Amino acid sequence: PDPLVFDKQTMEPLPLADQPHIGWLTRIAQLAVEAGAGMAFLDPVTRLIWGGMVENWHEGEHMPRAVMDTGLDFNDLCAQADAEAERLDAIIDANNDTLSAVGHWGVPCMVFEDEPFFGQDRMDLLSWRLDEAQKR
């Protein structure tokens, strides 16, 4: 399933309280970022969710196995995400505000030096820009 559930009538996302996946998923992603494993988390988890190989990515051992590849423990992340939900939600809300401020929504969207990179087809360009910036 899509991590973000929409109302079929309005095509608007359901309120966060009614979302079965996006809350815990973004919280553990934020914890991975804080642990210095954000990109390592992003690759296997996004492949699991959108790669088309697993129908119910959120069930069973699929997610714990994907997260294991990052060197992090899925159960530990979930426990920490529950314990720190308010703090993590504040960070996620601030990130959403920043995303809106640059005129974008959805994922993946990243901004580097005021240049937005939206969509998976722009990640190679972002990577190149980051590499070039390191050379300066």
PLM-predicted stretches and their roles:
Residues 1-49:
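Structural alpha/beta surface segment adjacent to cysteine/selenocysteine redox centers
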Residues 44-136:
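C-terminal cap of thioredoxin/glutaredoxin-like
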